[in-house]
A protein has these predicted regions:
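Short beta->alpha connector loops at strand-helix junctions that form conserved
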Residues: 39, 63, 83-84, 103-105, ...
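A cross-family phosphate/adenosyl-ligand binding-site feature
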Residues: 1-96, 135-169, 173-179
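Active-site/ligand-binding-proximal alpha/beta "capping" segment
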Residues: 90-122, 130
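Short, well-ordered alpha-helical segments in soluble proteins
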Residues: 104, 114-124, 145, 149-152, ...
Length: 179
């Protein structure tokens, strides 16, 4: 299974985040799954790639040309796919993924997982969309989705397939039910 993970090229200031990223990467590698991610060697992106590779897993990076020109790509990847721009990168990462996980991240992470959430809610994508809600990071987004339902702008049926989790065990449970 290809697990597309969205996360930042920064590490953030919460040590638990780095640990959770490394834990997921190790599990992906050890479980025989494959990682699809943004391709960078920096920050949390670099951490998940290293953890997956060190655990024997395959890692596909998807990076736009301008990042490659800046020499930000991870050198040890199983495969590096270079795209024209960020839009093409998002499309490719979705096409490659069987499941989608977003760690806490910045505006780029939010943009990427918002597109996945939209496709899942429209049933254009039949795959789990998982937000890793470490230390309540995504509570605001969770409340916004609930408010959409409350105001009649969405429905529980539309939001099926969107999950908020606290740890790796919950991710494993979702994947076990979905596949």
């Amino acid at each position: 299974m290809n697990i597309t993970v969205y996360l930042g090229a920064n590490e953030g200031n919460d040590p638990a985040l780095k640990q959770a990223v490394q834990e997921l990467g190790r599990w992906i590698g050890e479980s025989g799954n494959a990682l699809v991610y943004g391709g960078s060697r920096c920050g949390l992106m670099g951490e998940i790639a290293e953890s997956t590779l060190n655990a024997g897993g395959e890692v596909t990076g998807v990076e736009p040309e301008f990042f490659v020109q800046g020499e930000l790509q991870h050198e040890g990847l199983t495969e590096l796919i270079v795209t024209k721009d960020m839009t093409e990168r998002k499309t490719k990462m979705i096409a490659l993924g069987d499941v989608f996980i977003a760690f806490p991240g910045g505006t780029g992470t939010l943009e990427e997982i918002a597109e996945v959430m939209s496709k899942v809610s429209l049933r254009h994508l039949d795959a789990p969309c998982i937000l890793y809600n470490l230390n309540d990071y995504y509570d605001g987004l969770k409340a916004l989705l609930a408010r959409m339902i409350e105001k009649g702008l969405s429905s529980p049926e539309r939001q099926q397939g969107i999950y908020f989790v606290e740890d790796l065990e919950q991710i494993k449970e979702i994947l076990q039910k979905s596949f």
